[in-house]
């Protein structure tokens, strides 16, 4: 597949998601990194976003809760180029009813090559990267080229 580049601005659009058993870890991580997160545009699935806002006072654009379609909403935003990175603390020890949605979200994040952190260590590495604080580019699929090929 052909690729092109997408610019990520200095102020990133960050999606925050956590399974129930991981919500407190994500809230604590957001509290610890509040100063670093504040200048960015933050999105979250419903319950997670409300809890983060209550505990940190960070401004959050809340979507639906994951099981009610929030993971799917995030996937759509990623495909539209409206999310720059995903912080998703998921619980590998417990299945959730919306596992297919979670898998679809991870797949679409990979297709569109956005940085994904699935645990505290990776999230710490991601936000300590120089690219987090500056404008950068990521390579993404060239959808127009893909469509042109498919329509031949």
Swiss-Prot record:
> What chemistry does it catalyse, as a reaction equation?
dihydroxyacetone phosphate = methylglyoxal + phosphate
Q: Quote the record's binding site residues for substrate.
A: 19, 23, 45-48, 65-66, 98
Q: Which InterPro entries match?
A: Methylgl_synth, Methylglyoxal_synth_AS, MGS-like_dom, MGS-like_dom_sf
Q: Which residues form the active site?
A: 71
Question: In this protein, which residues make up the domain named MGS-like?
Answer: 6-152
Q: What GO molecular function annotations does the UniProt record carry, in alphabetical order?
A: methylglyoxal synthase activity
What SUPFAM superfamilies does the record point to? Answer: Methylglyoxal synthase-like
Keywords linked to the UniProt accession: Lyase
Q: List the GO terms this entry assigns under cellular component, sorted alphabetically.
A: cytosol
Q: Which GO terms describe its biological process?
A: methylglyoxal biosynthetic process
State its Enzyme Commission number(s): 4.2.3.3
Q: Which PANTHER family match?
A: METHYLGLYOXAL SYNTHASE
Entry function: Catalyzes the formation of methylglyoxal from dihydroxyacetone phosphate.
Name the family.
Answer: Belongs to the methylglyoxal synthase family.
In Swiss-Prot or TrEMBL terms, this protein is called: Methylglyoxal synthase
Q: Which organism is it from?
A: Histophilus somni (strain 129Pt) (Haemophilus somnus)
């Amino acid at each position: 597949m052909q690729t092109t580049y997408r610019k990520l601005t200095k102020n990133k659009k960050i999606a925050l998601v956590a399974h129930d058993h991981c919500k407190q870890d994500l809230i604590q991580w957001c509290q610890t990194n509040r100063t670093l997160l504040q200048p960015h545009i933050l999105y979250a699935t419903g319950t997670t976003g409300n809890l983060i806002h209550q505990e940190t006072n960070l401004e959050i654009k809340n979507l639906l809760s994951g099981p009610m379609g929030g993971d799917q909403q995030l996937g759509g935003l990623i495909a539209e180029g409206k999310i720059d990175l995903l912080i998703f603390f998921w619980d590998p020890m417990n299945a959730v009813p919306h596992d297919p949605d979670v898998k679809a979200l991870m797949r679409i994040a990979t297709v569109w090559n956005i940085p994904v952190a699935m645990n505290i260590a990776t999230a710490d590495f991601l936000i300590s990267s120089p690219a987090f604080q500056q404008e950068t580019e990521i390579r993404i699929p060239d959808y127009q080229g893909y469509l042109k090929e498919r329509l031949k």
